UniProtKB/Swiss-Prot annotation:
Residue ranges annotated for the HTH lacI-type domain, each copy included: 12-67
Activity regulation field: 2-ketogluconate acts as a molecular effector and causes dissociation of PtxS from its target promoter. Glucose negatively affects the molecular binding of PtxS and 2KGA, and gluconic acid inhibits the PtxS-2KGA binding reaction.
Function recorded in the entry: Involved in the regulation of 2-ketogluconic acid metabolism via the control of the expression of the kgu operon. Binds directly to a 14-bp palindrome sequence via its conserved HTH motif.
DNA-binding region extent: 14-33
Identification of the protein by name: HTH-type transcriptional regulator PtxS
Length: 340
């Protein structure tokens, strides 16, 4: 085939895959439709090799036109064990159900290979749209998928994607935390974050913390990432007293749990010596001492807004991609007593 004509081709067809693999179109359809177990291993392997060689991708849009919408929404999650992810997923499922849609969830477990597998599978799924909360290490594949179906990001911005984003106003949340700690008399503040790892929400919180500390007179701020070194680093921070009353700001629920694991030995006296404000408000926060002061994320509103954005795109909205940042709510508990 002429090279120029080959390059001009925009999409390999299922007929070409069937011809190259020596099987019928129905057999290829069965393979890409998730019924691989019905095929002989040799046949499935031959089809798989041809698909990879030709770069074939199922035409999801054409399939949708033939069969109509499935009223299925896909959701790609980085870590289904993360309390934030669970809360948002529940909110998305609720909003989908209210609008007559069902939710299909794929969990990557923060694993790049698994994320790639799910993306490849989602290219063949007949979902009407996709909500994404993931590490984004395969932004190219996500961008390609976004050309085929509506997509909305939750919590994490991916520069390569021009899609709607719904999440927390991270700068405002950090400002609320530091305003509260400052007003309560804390002067030496340590922020603890999960590893940044290119995750935009974590980066925004750390950057906002550093910028806010720099603007405030009399405050000292440091940042640590959760790692195997955290116990020693926390001990070093506590031993460096001298700049004034100390406090911790944990940047999400996972970081809060890690901090508390290493500080639980202090028992009920903990918050008499050290303040703590945590971003996220988990069920166990009120149970620790006099309770942990928290910045509650409006997860139900975030989820509902993400679904609404997706539905608007499904209805044909051509508005420019937008970012919706929702405000956290400060909940004061016993972990931030006033210091003289």
């Amino acid at each position: 085939m002429d090279k120029t004509l080959s390059q001009a081709r925009t999409r390999v067809t299922i007929s070409e895959v069937a011809q190259a693999a020596g099987v019928s179109k129905a057999t290829v359809s069965r393979y890409i439709g998730g019924d691989r177990q019905l095929l002989a291993d040799a046949t499935a392997q031959r089809i798989e090799a041809v698909i990879e060689q030709l770069g074939y991708r199922p035409n999801r849009m054409a399939s949708a036109l033939k069969r109509g919408r499935t009223r299925l929404i896909g959701m790609l999650l980085a870590d289904i064990r993360n309390p934030y992810s669970v809360a948002v997923m529940h909110g998305v499922e609720t909003a989908c159900r209210e609008h007559g849609y069902s939710l299909v969830v794929c969990n990557t477990d923060c694993d790049d290979a698994r994320e790639r597998q799910h993306l490849q599978a989602l290219q063949a799924y007949n979902v009407d749209g996709l909500i994404v909360n993931t590490l984004g290490h395969h932004a190219g594949e996500l961008a390609s998928l976004a050309q085929e179906l509506p997509m909305v990001l939750v919590d994490r911005q991916l520069a390569e994607l021009q899609t709607d984003l719904v999440g927390l106003d991270n700068a405002d949340a950090v400002e609320q935390a530091l305003d509260h700690l400052h007003a309560c008399g804390y002067r030496d503040i340590l922020a603890v974050s999960e590893p940044l790892d290119g995750t935009s929400s974590r980066q925004e919180r750390v950057a906002a913390f550093q910028a806010s500390i720099a603007r405030r007179s009399g405050l000292r701020g440091q940042v640590l990432e959760v790692s195997a070194n955290l116990p020693g680093q926390l001990a070093a921070f506590l031993a460096s007293a001298g700049h004034g009353p100390q406090a911790l700001f944990s940047c999400n629920g996972v970081a809060t749990l890690e901090v508390m694991r290493h500080l639980h030995g202090r028992g009920e006296q903990l918050f008499q010596q050290l303040g703590l404000v945590a971003l996220d408000d988990l069920d166990w926060y009120p149970l620790v001492g006099g309770g942990i002061t928290a910045l509650a994320q409006p997860t139900e509103r975030i989820a509902a807004a993400a679904v609404q954005c997706l539905l608007e795109r499904l209805q044909g909205s051509q508005l420019p991609a937008r970012r919706l940042d929702l405000r956290a709510q400060l909940i004061v508990r016993g972990s931030t007593p006033i210091r003289n």
